[in-house]
A protein has these predicted regions:
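Non-catalytic structural scaffold of enzyme domains
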Residues: 1-232
């Protein structure tokens, strides 16, 4: 039996406006806490921001990150214009520029980096669960002009908050393909579970924020598991 620990670090949200040093300290403290309390075999850092900004292998060999699937985007774009949708700190960083240079993306592809911090906030606040019209208006405000002006037809959801908005995104931008970066790391985790004979999993959920509010939002998504408080 395997135990899956989900830790929502709401206390330190948003990661997207933190400095590199602040992020490094947060991730170090979080990993230390998780290792001391749970002794995990594998830790997924389910955020593109620290994945791209930090040399996380120096923090722990157990850590795995989530990266924008740019190679996949480049293969399917017909207009040769793709977008990275991410937090402000990622979009403005040299790290994402270096990552782009390392990716196997054809030379004729134009990559547009778009600050989607306002969209991340829609998810973190739970607004996406209660006010569809408001969320769609914010999405249009952030993305509509840049998508249309640049003929963008593929976008990577390079914040793990953004896939929660995918139904809205698809309904507004019917000719744009949105790629979820979590799918690649989920395959890695699946292989790990199968190779270690962990066929039945138990989910335990923790937050460093408001337990009752987080539980309420989870229930609205059909998740009725117990939520406990945990903080670094």
């Amino acid at each position: 039996k395997g135990e899956l620990i989900y830790f929502a670090d709401q206390k330190n949200f948003p990661y997207g406006v933190k400095s590199k040093k602040e992020l490094e300290n947060i991730i170090k403290d979080t990993v230390n806490l998780l290792e001391e309390k749970f002794s995990p075999d594998f830790i997924i850092m389910a955020s593109n921001t620290p994945t791209l900004l930090l040399d996380y292998s120096r923090i722990s060999k157990k850590l795995a990150g989530i990266y924008p699937p740019l190679s996949d985007a480049g293969k399917i774009s017909r207009t040769r214009n793709i977008a990275i949708l991410g937090t402000r700190s990622v979009i403005q960083s040299e790290s994402v520029t270096e990552f782009i240079e390392k990716c196997n993306v054809p030379n004729d592809i134009v990559i547009h980096k778009i600050d989607c911090s306002l969209l991340v906030e829609l998810v973190e606040s739970g607004k996406f669960l209660t006010d569809e019209e408001y969320c769609k208006n914010i999405i249009k405000e952030v993305l509509e002009d840049v998508f249309l002006d640049n003929l963008i037809d593929v976008a990577t959801l390079s914040s793990t908050h953004l896939p929660f908005l995918e139904p809205f995104l698809r309904s507004i931008f019917k000719n744009v393909k949105f790629l979820d970066p979590a799918k690649n790391i989920s395959n890695v985790l699946k292989d790990f579970v199968e190779n270690n004979d962990l066929q039945q999993n138990v989910l335990r959920i923790f937050t460093s924020g408001d337990v009752n509010l987080f539980k309420k939002n989870l229930q609205m998504m059909g998740i009725d598991d117990e939520v406990n408080f945990l903080t670094i």
